[in-house]
Amino acid sequence: IAQVSIDPAYQLKPEAKKSAPIDKMLGADISFLPELEAKNIKFSDKGLEKDAIQILKDHGFNYVRLRIFHNPAQPKGYSPTKGFCDLVHTKEMVKRAKALGMKVLLDFHYSDYWADPGKQFKPLAWEGKNFSDLKKSLYDYTYEVMQALKAQGTLPDMVQVGNEINHGLVWPEGSFSNTDQLAQLINAGTAAVKAV
């Protein structure tokens, strides 16, 4: 039986308000869109060139999913030369989606690169931190991203604290073999989301 420590520094706050229920959710992960557009790739619907997000909306989509990496521009990151899926790109994408009336699911990878069941490498900036500082870094980063989105009036409608965390997140501290620490990291990220 797993036991989970509750860190009083990351107490969960109740939600400020409940989202209005929706009849259906139909969404797409459009995180690649800025990369495709940077390559001058165009999108069309029945021969008419349109914004890709508008095409989704026109076909009944009401949600988009956007991933965010901690620092994808660092040399071993996801996008060393462009920084795709960083906070700057994510803010712009959320703004575009919200302007078209789409809802947004924000997916925190807590890595500079892909995080999935086979790898959950912590950001380079968090390497060497003790667990308490690692947890604080995860909280602070989550809070800063949420605050930045709130400041531009585009808070996400849903947040995914970690990507594909079947085997944990922010390895090795948050691996599934360290369930107490994993739970504390998830709790810290969730607390940061709810604090905004």
Task: Please tell me what each predicted stretch does.
Residues 1-6:
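Bacterial Sec-dependent N-terminal signal peptides
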Residues 80, 85-89, 115-196:
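Active-site cleft segment of glycoside hydrolase catalytic domains centered on the general acid/base Glu
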Residues 7-103, 111-138, 160:
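N-terminal substrate-binding region of glycoside hydrolase catalytic domains
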